[in-house]
């Protein structure tokens, strides 16, 4: 209930609601599946719409992808969020931090991983991880957003 109250007080007043918008989506941040989180001015968001019931498979893909980035000591960070309510509850969101639009080129080709996974994990494991991604991901949508700190509230500083 506290999440809904917080949303009603602090988030919904800032949303542009049209006639087709009927509910909020709630995202849960996954520290365990994110890699080297960083503050950002802009973010390239990649919404991965997965097949219902494939959550554990997609988590296995995410763990493999993070492992490959760790082995490769990648400089490209990402944050993982799971949409847990609303019209698309089987959606995972990747947030790649950017300072300028040109930074998007470093995140645009990551998809299922390709050569990046193979170099870090070997061909057999990269193929296995990529097969999981191809099997459970129905579609993907991308978006660029700007961070709006004035619309954020700090944890523990919620006013009643």
Model-derived segments and their meaning:
Residues 1-160:
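Short S/T/G/P-rich N-terminal loop/turn motif that feeds into the first structured element of a domain
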